[in-house]
């Protein structure tokens, strides 16, 4: 009698492995230990996590970790046992959304930072087995965090190989992505795509991949106007493409209005941020369910650093009436402690 092997459904996952192996002379960590950088004792010539971050962390990551009011302040995360992962495993909540489930979502992002930058895990896992919904803004925040971490790791490994091999995990993995809609978002515009691991096409998805623009260097500033025009056109063309999927179109006037709106948002996100860096991403899904056919378009434009209100309140030439209105608008977003 022959027994047939059961065909089990494959669970989607992704893996980012860094180009080094742990040396046999190094102890394999069991679980994790909290290591405040001020009390870490490292062998001669080896830098601690804190020292490596101080030297090589990109601007956005450094801002997130060091700003006192940031929900991702590294000193606060070190002290908070609720922000630790489970032996390197971070379970993504059922609803991963800073809008609909802010407390649990912020804690999850803090756990990711702890797993990567505080604990001594050999590997870090993001477990999506419980998750059935992610909003695109929260996905973007997570992806930017991981991209900044990846940039940091690449630079630090080139310059301080021994220290990085001793202090950091050799890879990160997303696993148990069982929900079909989550799988489509994650593999089209999410972490695997942003980190350059893999990017997949789906017949019902139109993506506008993560765009990152900065004006930190002189060359960046010279190209600012041209890049803004290019990105504005790209975003409007993307919206037009999504509308065409639904057999809809924009009139020339409405297209021009949309160009004006996108252009203003992009330039505000760039010029009025203290970090002079903006990100944008778009995601469209063609949906047929319960006898209804419709499209869902989601766009995110964000930056890190000071808010527009914080920027203008320090400008003596800005009218006080405008500053007061901006303060009220800012407080409507910050009263839930989602943003600084």
Residue ranges with predicted function:
Residues 244, 266, 270-274, 302, ...:
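Signal for well-folded cores of large energy- and translation-related assemblies
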Residues 184-232:
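Internal, well-ordered alpha/beta segment that forms a basic, Gly-enriched binding/recognition surface
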Residues 139-150, 240, 259-266:
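Short, well-ordered alpha-helical packing segments
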Residues 252-289:
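Conserved ATP-binding N-box helix of the HATPase_c
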Residues 1-195:
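N-terminal assembly/transducer modules of large multi-domain enzymes
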Residues 177-180, 212, 263:
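Short, conserved secondary-structure transition motifs
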Residues 222-253:
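Intrinsically disordered, low-complexity linker/loop segments enriched in Gly/Pro
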Residues 291-340:
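Glycine-rich/acidic phosphate-handling loop/turn and adjacent ATP-lid/helix
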């Amino acid at each position: 009698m022959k027994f047939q092997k059961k065909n089990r459904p494959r669970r989607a996952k992704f893996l980012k492995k860094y180009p080094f192996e742990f040396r046999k002379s190094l102890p394999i960590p069991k679980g994790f230990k909290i290591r405040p950088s001020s009390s870490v004792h490292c062998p001669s010539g080896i830098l601690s996590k804190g020292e490596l971050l101080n030297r090589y962390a990109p601007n956005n990551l450094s801002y997130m970790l060091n700003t006192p009011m940031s929900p991702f302040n590294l000193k606060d995360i070190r002290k908070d046992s609720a922000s630790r992962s489970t032996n390197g495993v971070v379970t993504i909540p059922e609803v991963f959304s800073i809008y609909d489930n802010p407390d649990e979502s912020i804690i999850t992002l803090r756990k990711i930072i702890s797993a990567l930058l505080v604990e001594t895990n050999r590997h870090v896992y993001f477990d999506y087995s419980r998750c059935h919904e992610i909003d695109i803004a929260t996905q973007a925040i997570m992806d930017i965090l991981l991209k900044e971490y990846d940039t940091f790791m690449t630079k630090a490994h080139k310059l301080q190989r021994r220290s990085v091999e001793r202090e950091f995990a050799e890879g990160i993995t997303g696993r148990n992505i069982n929900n079909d809609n989550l799988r489509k978002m994650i593999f089209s515009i999410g972490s695997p795509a942003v980190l350059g691991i893999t990017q997949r096409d789906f017949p019902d998805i139109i993506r506008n991949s993560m765009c990152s623009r900065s004006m930190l260097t002189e060359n960046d500033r010279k190209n600012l106007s041209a890049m803004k025009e290019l990105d504005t056109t790209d975003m409007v063309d993307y919206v037009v493409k999504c509308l065409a999927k639904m057999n809809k179109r924009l009139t020339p006037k409405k297209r021009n209005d949309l160009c004006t709106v996108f252009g203003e948002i992009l330039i505000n996100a760039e010029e009025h941020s203290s970090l002079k860096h903006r990100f944008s991403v778009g995601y469209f899904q063609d949906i047929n369910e319960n006898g209804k056919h419709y499209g869902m378009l989601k766009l995110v434009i964000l930056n890190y650093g000071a808010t527009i209100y914080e920027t203008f309140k320090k400008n003596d030439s800005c009218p006080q009436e405008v500053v007061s209105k901006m303060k009220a608008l800012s407080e409507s977003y910050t009263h839930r402690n989602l943003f600084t």
